[in-house]
Amino acid sequence: MELAEDWLVESLRLYQDFHAFDLSGATRVLEWIGEKGVFVAGYESLKKNEILHLILPLRLSVQENQGLHPERDFKVRHGGFSDRSVFDLKHVPDTRLLVTSGLPGCYIQMWQVREDNDVIEAVSTIDVQDKEESLWPRVSVFCSKAPGILHGARLSGLRTVDVESQKITYSSGTADSESLSCLQVLDANTFAFCGNSGRLGLVDTRQKWAALETVSPGSGCSGERWCAEVRNKGQGPGPCIASLGSDGQLCLLDSRNLCHPVSSAQCPVFKPSPDPELLRVTWAPGLDNCLAISGFDGTVQIYDVTSWDGKKTQAEPLFTHKGHIFLDGNDVDSAPLVTTHTWHPRKPRTLLSAASDSSLHVWDWVDLQAS
């Protein structure tokens, strides 16, 4: 309890802003729509799960230090129910459409956010090629005049389906059965993938399958399960791919040479991730060479990778969000597990994070080293 009390006092110095919200169920989904709205969705099995469109607190636009605000001041704009668990959700830009994936993974679901009422309704399903009991398809969205849904649980089952016609516009055509941990569309013709084993690849959909990829994690990068994210163009110089292992190994790679990491570091995690499905690494859209990781415990860790060199180093976080541990009086051993996090698209140091106890936090952290 003393640790929790100490953190509450320290939080006035650590955060420019902090809001807490209790969802009706835990979420693995935090998907932005604009700068003020976010989608969340439940992932419990054998029950209906809510899909909600939340509007963030208006006071986030206030600049002065406001301290803690553990109150229910998020607003529900739209809502709906899914008959299955929702592990991933993507908004189709410039439309009112959503796509969700989860278990059972025999299809992905299309949804429409109604304009004339507050309902999110299911409108269609898209069959997937890999129909295995324990696998669910990863999804990403090609943004163009004719948007497409990229999906697949394995490399062999990767397909793109046109949103309007639901015709298949791309198929990987490979027999490679590597299971996927994440997919990320990069532009109108290319996407990146990360396999559970750590394989990374860049694919041009205009060409026959010939992915520029790593065969396995590079030298010095060991781990049982992996996830990755590619930094958007224009986010500063340096390595553009971050790959995170379930043992806390973090590798930075250049897209022109995926076989050899530019640098790697060991993050200070006390034990491997208890649920590698929840591993997440994200680049900060408004800060150069800054990223966040979660999925190991009740924290979100933020790193400045500017000083990392080619040697394996012991990384120290620039900031650690411990609100999911201490805000409700938990101790470290009984703390909930952070299920996901995301950066605000416009506010450089503002993040959202969710945890297995159904808590949802939005927080603007202070860079104490800079101050």
UniProtKB/Swiss-Prot annotation:
Designated name of the protein: Integrator complex assembly factor WDR73
Oligomer and partners: Interacts with INTS9 and INTS11; the interaction is direct. Part of the multiprotein complex composed of BRAT1, WDR73, as well as integrator complex subunits INTS9 and INTS11.
Function: Component of a multiprotein complex required for the assembly of the RNA endonuclease module of the integrator complex. Associates with INTS9 and INTS11 in the cytoplasm, stabilizing the INTS9-INTS11 heterodimer and blocking the active site of INTS11. BRAT1 then joins the complex and plugs the active site of INTS11, leading to WDR73 release and nuclear import of INTS9 and INTS11.
Keyword vocabulary terms for this entry: Cytoplasm, Cytoskeleton, Repeat, WD repeat
GO MF term (any one): protein-macromolecule adaptor activity
Positions of disulphide bridges: none
The keyword Repeat is assigned to this record: yes
InterPro entries: WD40/YVTN_repeat-like_dom_sf, WD40_repeat_dom_sf, WD40_rpt, Wdr73
SUPFAM superfamilies found in the cross-reference section: WD40 repeat-like
Predominant cellular place of this UniProt entry's protein: cytoplasm
Protein family according to the UniProt entry: Belongs to the WD repeat WDR73 family.
GO biological process, one term: nucleus organization
Gene3D superfamilies: YVTN repeat-like/Quinoprotein amine dehydrogenase
Lineage summary: Eukaryota, Metazoa, Chordata, Craniata, Vertebrata
Gene Ontology annotations for the cellular component aspect, listed alphabetically: cleavage furrow; cytoplasm; cytosol; spindle pole
WD repeat residues: 81-121, 273-313, 333-371
Entries under PANTHER family matching the protein: WD REPEAT-CONTAINING PROTEIN 73
Signal sequence annotation: none
Cellular localization per UniProt: Cytoplasm; Cytoplasm, Cytoskeleton, Spindle; Cytoplasm, Cytoskeleton, Spindle pole; Cleavage furrow
